[in-house]
């Protein structure tokens, strides 16, 4: 086992960039699509726990976009369609039983848009494959169910496994709504997710429409950031300034883009190794 640390770098007018460090493995890093600054006052340690470096190292999935390397995507798929750096960071942290928290500016919003791990089903299959290759044990569903204080990653896993028996099967967006409600209750138990469920559904519909437009790169980034700005305003009005700031990590009225300026060229662009958009 080795210590896995989730870090956040502040970016002006944008959600924090997140990455994962493993000091016990010779100061190895999972950069999560970008090139984070690892020094200076603008980085914050968000979480830290013991996990498996070999398992995380198995699914780095760096991608080559026309000669530019986007490192350590965690196989989440297509940037801005399946997730952003926050989802990749959570994938690298999963064996440590922790996730990013709402201390990360803008993380709550990317959770609403993409979930904790991007496409849970796609990531879980890759995670099991890498766990098997590394000889790591994955707890059975029954072991999770009887745990007194199951970790948030295990609660998310249980949520998705329980949905497998539903008829008709819930849509991907419905699962994102349920997952975000679970995570919100975990980190802010006094905030009722029912207060924003309808707005969450509207956000997902607007995000899907932007993706279905066929735009890519800077144009898609601009469209998604505009959707984010619109719904940030609506959510702040519904929840109130104090609650909104607790969840978003920024004051109401402060715009937080979800697509990083330095990663716009990857937005919506499929490359070998990218996963499809996700389950319906």
Task: Annotate the PLM regions.
Residues 149-280:
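Charge-rich (acidic/polar
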Residues 1-162:
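Non-catalytic ligand/cofactor/substrate-binding and regulatory segments of enzyme domains
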């Amino acid at each position: 086992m080795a210590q896995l640390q989730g870090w956040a770098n502040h970016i002006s007018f944008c959600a924090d960039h997140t990455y994962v460090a493993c000091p016990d493995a010779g100061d190895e890093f999972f950069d999560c699509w970008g090139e984070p600054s690892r020094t200076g006052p603008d980085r914050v340690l968000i979480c830290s726990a013991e996990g498996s470096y070999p398992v995380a190292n198995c699914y780095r999935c760096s991608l080559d976009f026309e000669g530019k390397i986007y490192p350590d995507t965690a196989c989440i798929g297509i940037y801005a369609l399946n997730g952003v750096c926050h989802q990749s960071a959570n994938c690298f942290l999963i064996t440590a039983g922790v996730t990013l928290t709402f201390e990360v500016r803008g993380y709550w919003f990317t959770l609403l848009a993409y979930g904790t791990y991007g496409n849970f089903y796609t990531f879980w299959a890759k995670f099991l494959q890498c766990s098997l290759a590394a000889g790591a044990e994955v707890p059975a569903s029954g072991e999770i169910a009887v745990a007194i204080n199951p970790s948030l990653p295990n609660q998310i896993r249980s949520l998705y496994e329980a949905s497998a028996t539903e008829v008709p099967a819930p849509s991907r967006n419905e699962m994102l709504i349920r997952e975000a409600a679970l995570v919100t209750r975990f980190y802010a138990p006094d905030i009722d997710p029912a207060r924003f469920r309808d707005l969450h559904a509207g956000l997902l519909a607007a995000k899907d429409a932007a993706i279905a437009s066929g735009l890519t790169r800077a144009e898609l980034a601009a469209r998604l950031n505009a959707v984010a700005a619109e719904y940030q305003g609506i959510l702040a009005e519904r929840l109130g300034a104090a609650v909104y700031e607790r969840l978003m990590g920024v004051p109401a009225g402060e715009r937080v883009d979800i697509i990083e300026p330095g990663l716009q060229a990857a937005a919506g662009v499929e490359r070998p190794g990218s996963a499809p958009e996700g389950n319906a």
